[in-house]
Design a protein with these regions (language model features):
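Conserved beta-strand positions in the Rossmann-like core of class I SAM-dependent methyltransferases
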Residues: 11, 32-33
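Class I SAM-dependent methyltransferase "Motif I" SAM/SAH-binding loop
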Residues: 13-18
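Well-ordered alpha-helical segments embedded in enzymatic catalytic cores
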Residues: 19, 44, 105-108
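S-adenosyl-L-methionine
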Residues: 35, 43-75
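Conserved SAM/SAH-binding beta-strand->alpha-helix loop
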Residues: 38
Length: 210
């Protein structure tokens, strides 16, 4: 059993059945809360907790729509936010409507970062996110995570907001609440998993974090 007194605090959105959460737990993060909309996934985690699996006994799992989650009181208390937003808007097997798909939850990932201001965040999604047809929207996601405090005004399109963010990025006029954001396409098979599973991993570090 790990010494949780030395762990960094984290919350996870779109936690599914807890695979990413378990990996981060093993890496030294203590999950304050895990949010997932799907009941079966939540029941799966709760069954594993009840079965006494090591390291997850203190997980607090909430079956919630992340659009209703309040992060009041968490600013400065959470070191990391993680999660895997629904992949259907970008999946090769879906309709690939990106921002126009109501299941696109990247805006909620950005909201969580903006309201909690963690030291670091990590989000993963399918490799379809890197398709040429999504290039502008993907750059929009990265810009939002880089400057989460620049909120899209009511009535502004995402394309217009992207242009605004790009202008800020180019001129470097907006220094507060910035994150250094990087992304990589990774294959789980390269890390000991017996499965070809490609995922885009987006990581951001708050600029005041050394």
């Amino acid at each position: 059993m790990q010494n949780t007194t030395l762990m960094n605090k984290s919350i996870e959105l779109f936690c599914g059945t807890g695979g990413l959460a378990l990996g981060l737990q093993n890496a030294g993060f203590q999950h304050t809360a895990l949010y997932e909309w799907d009941k079966d996934s939540c029941d799966n985690i709760k069954a594993n907790i009840a079965a006494g699996f090591d390291g997850i006994s203190d997980w607090n799992v909430y079956q919630s729509d992340v659009r209703t989650v309040s992060y009041d009181g968490l600013t400065g208390k959470i070191n990391m936010i993680s999660g895997g937003p629904p992949c259907q808007p970008f999946s090769l097997g879906g309709k690939a409507q990106a921002y126009n798909d109501k299941r696109d939850m990247f805006p909620e990932a950005v909201r969580a970062v903006r309201e909690v201001m963690p030291e670091v965040f990590i989000f993963e999604n399918v490799k379809g996110l890197l398709r040429k047809s999504f290039s502008l929207y993907f750059s929009y996601i990265i810009l939002q995570l880089t400057y989460p405090s620049i909120v899209k005004p009511q009535g502004m399109t995402w394309e217009e907001h992207r242009t605004l963010l790009e202008q800020h990025h180019t001129s470097n006029r907006h220094g507060d609440c910035e994150y250094n954001v990087v992304f990589r396409l990774l294959n789980a098979a390269d890390y000991g998993v017996p499965q070809l599973r490609h995922r885009v991993v987006i990581v951001g570090f708050r600029k005041d974090v050394d």
